[in-house]
Amino acid sequence: TIAARLTRAKQAIARSGERFSWPGTEDRAERLGAALTTIYGVYTLGHTAVAGSDLIDSRLSGLAILLARSIVAEYPGDTEALGLLALIELGEARGAARTTLDGMPLTLAEVDRSVWGRRRIRRGLELAALALPGGGRFALQAGIAGLHSSAATWAETDWGAISTLYHGLSRVWPAPVVILGGIIARSHLGPSELDRAAVELRRLSGRASAEFNRRVFAALADVEERRGEEGLASEALAAASLGEKNEALLRYYARVSERLARRAR
């Protein structure tokens, strides 16, 4: 367990005779980037649980927002700290609508936006506005989350602006997940971009971890369904399900699979 690991770590430190002191202001500033990345990682694990029956691990997402707020309290003028807090606030504001009452995940196109926490969204947008001039990784991610949160309906989503922010994000943080997000955003810009997305997603698969590949295939399933290719969508969905341990996601994939099977008849 985590408690046992902490106990062993404390015992090892005690045996070593090492002494640790609280870092000074300059040292803390130098470590800020690593701290923000760690908090983001914690939030990501909470946003979609690695395993279990629930889509969300609220313990981890709650811890992440607590840590992000404490960092902003320490560094109120740091645009990346503000961006990370904005990103988490906006995500949490939409959290209650991400599943049905029985825990079935919903897409952004399906959610009831009236359930979103509007006060929290306003706070997140204010933080994002302060962060965006910095042009950093978390600031740009907050901008993307802000555009999603500002759309009154799915149809009103500004995919052009979101695609532009993803392009900027790929320049400062060219991670596979950013490339994936950019492809998904562009796929909503018209039929030619939708066809292009199908090709790009297949090219992207296999470039990172098994967990990431499952996300790629889930996106590909959506793209192929929108293209009217139910058979290809079903194949992609099967690949997305392979090795998935989050039971809520598996229930969602089963629901989509049933829908595809009905359409293919």
Predicted segments, located by residue:
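Amphipathic helix-loop-helix modules that constitute alpha-helical solenoid scaffolds
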Residues: 3-167
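Short, solvent-exposed positions on alpha-helices
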Residues: 4, 79-80, 177, 231, ...
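"A position-specific structural signal for the A-helix of alpha-solenoid helical repeats
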Residues: 84, 88-91, 141, 145, ...
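C-terminal non-catalytic interaction modules
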Residues: 206-265
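TPR/TPR-like alpha-solenoid repeats
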Residues: 88, 95, 149-151, 185-189, ...
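Alpha-helical solenoid scaffolds that mediate protein-protein interactions
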Residues: 64, 71, 93, 131, ...
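Alpha-helical adaptor scaffolds
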Residues: 108-114, 133, 137-218
